[in-house]
C-alpha cells in the first residue's frame, strides 16, 4: 500500500553507552512489529569481541590456586570474562596482562595493543598480596556474535583454559509504543526504543546495524519474486552444488588467515554461504579486498565451483542459443 505512513527516527538522548530513539509516525501495530524485530537483532545478531581462552603462567587448569593472590583461578576467570574489548583492525589476536608486586590488578594493566582497545580499564581483576608476586597472562580474543559456551577441555592443550564468551555488545533493550496523531489522523503510534551497550559500540550505530540486517533479510524475499519472474520469462538456467561442497567449512579451502577471519567476522562459515554472497557483496566486507577475492576464486576453482555460477551459466546458455541459431540459418 502506497499510503502507509513513512516513519523517521530521532535520537533524543545518548551518552555513549545508552541511547533513546523515537520512531514516528507508524501505522497502528507497526510499533510492536518493528520494536520486537530490532530488539531480537540487537540482542542476538550483532558482531562483538570476547576473550575465549586464557593461559596463566604456572597454572594448568581452572581449579589450581593462584599463588600470592587473594582470588582463586575461578574468580579471576569470572572477572576476565567481564573485560570488554573493541577490535580496531577487525581481526582476532592476543592480549597480554602482566603485573608484579603487591597491588590491585585491573584491566588497565593489560598491555596496549594496536589491534584492540579495552573500553572498561577500571574493571577489577584480582589483588596480588606479596611483594614478590608475578602474574603473566595471555588472553585469546576472538570475533563472534551472541553467546558461545567454552570449548571442551579435550580439544585444548594443557595450560590453556577455555572460557565461555559473551560476544554481544548489547546489554539491554527496551521498547514501548505510544499513540499519536498527525493532523486529523489519530490511528498512528510512535515507537520509543532504549538501548544499553557495553561501550564497544555506539547505541546509534547498533540500531543502524540491526536495521541493516533486517533490510538484507527481507530484501531476499523481494528479489525472489523478481528472480522467479525473470526465470519464467526466459529459458531456465539451473545450478546445483553438491551438499558436501555446499556445507564445506571455509577453513578447508586453505585460505589465508586474514581471508578466513574476514569471512567469519561477517558470519560466513561455509562454501555455500560464500557463493550466496557473490562478488559484489564480498567486496563490501571489512578488510576483504581484491587480493582476498582473487585468492578465494582460485580456491573455489580447484573444487569445481565459482563465485558467480549464475552468470557463467547464463553466458553459456546465451552462447548455446547463438550456436543453435547459426545452425538453423545454415
From Swiss-Prot:
InterPro entries tied to this protein: DNA-dir_RNA_pol_insert, DNA-dir_RNA_pol_RpoA/D/Rpb3, DNA-dir_RpoA, RBP11-like, RNAP_asu_C, RNApol_insert_sf
GO cellular component terms, A-Z: cytoplasm; DNA-directed RNA polymerase complex
Keyword Repeat recorded: no
Annotated GO MF terms: DNA binding; DNA-directed RNA polymerase activity; protein dimerization activity
Superkingdom as given in the UniProt entry: Bacteria
EC number(s) per entry: 2.7.7.6
Notes on the domains: The N-terminal domain is essential for RNAP assembly and basal transcription, whereas the C-terminal domain is involved in interaction with transcriptional regulators and with upstream promoter elements.
Function in brief: DNA-dependent RNA polymerase catalyzes the transcription of DNA into RNA using the four ribonucleoside triphosphates as substrates.
Subunit architecture: Homodimer. The RNAP catalytic core consists of 2 alpha, 1 beta, 1 beta' and 1 omega subunit. When a sigma factor is associated with the core the holoenzyme is formed, which can initiate transcription.
Protein name from the UniProt record: DNA-directed RNA polymerase subunit alpha
Species name: Dehalococcoides mccartyi (strain CBDB1)
Gene that specifies this protein: rpoA
Amino acid at each position: 500500500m502506497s499510503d502507509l505512513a513513512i516513519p523517521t527516527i530521532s535520537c533524543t538522548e545518548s551518552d555513549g553507552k545508552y541511547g533513546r530513539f523515537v520512531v514516528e509516525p507508524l501505522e497502528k501495530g507497526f510499533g510492536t512489529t518493528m520494536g520486537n524485530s530490532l530488539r531480537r537483532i540487537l540482542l542476538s545478531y550483532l558482531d562483538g569481541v570476547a576473550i575465549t581462552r586464557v593461559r596463566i603462567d604456572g597454572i594448568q587448569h581452572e581449579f589450581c590456586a593462584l599463588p600470592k593472590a587473594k582470588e582463586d583461578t575461578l574468580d579471576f576467570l569470572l572477572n576476565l570474562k567481564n573485560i570488554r574489548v573493541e577490535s580496531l583492525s577487525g581481526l582476532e589476536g592476543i592480549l597480554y596482562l602482566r603485573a608484579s608486586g603487591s597491588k590491585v590488578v585491573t584491566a588497565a594493566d593489560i598491555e596496549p595493543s594496536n589491534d584492540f582497545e579495552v573500553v572498561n580499564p577500571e574493571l577489577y581483576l584480582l589483588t596480588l598480596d606479596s611483594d614478590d608476586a608475578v602474574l603473566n597472562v595471555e588472553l585469546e580474543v576472538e570475533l563472534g556474535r551472541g553467546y558461545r559456551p567454552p570449548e571442551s577441555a579435550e580439544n585444548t592443550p594443557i595450560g590453556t583454559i577455555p572460557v565461555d564468551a559473551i560476544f554481544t555488545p548489547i546489554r539491554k533493550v527496551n521498547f514501548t509504543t505510544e499513540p499519536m496523531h498527525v493532523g486529523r489522523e489519530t490511528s498512528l503510534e510512535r515507537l520509543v526504543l532504549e538501548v544499553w551497550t557495553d561501550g564497544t559500540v555506539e547505541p546509534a550505530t547498533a540500531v543502524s546495524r540491526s536495521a541493516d540486517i533486517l533490510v538484507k533479510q527481507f530484501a531476499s524475499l523481494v528479489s525472489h519474486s523478481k528472480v522467479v519472474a525473470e526465470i519464467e520469462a526466459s529459458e531456465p538456467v539451473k545450478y546445483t552444488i553438491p551438499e558436501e561442497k555446499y556445507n564445506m567449512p571455509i577453513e578447508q579451502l586453505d585460505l589465508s588467515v586474514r581471508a578466513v577471519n574476514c569471512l567469519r567476522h561477517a558470519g560466513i562459515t561455509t562454501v555455500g554461504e560464500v557463493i550466496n554472497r557473490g562478488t559484489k557483496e564480498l567486496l563490501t566486507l571489512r578488510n576483504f579486498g581484491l587480493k582476498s577475492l582473487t585468492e578465494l576464486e582460485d580456491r573455489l576453482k580447484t573444487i569445481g565451483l565459482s563465485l558467480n555460477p549464475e552468470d557463467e551459466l547464463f553466458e553459456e546458455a546465451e552462447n548455446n542459443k547463438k550456436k543453435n541459431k547459426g545452425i538453423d540459418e545454415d
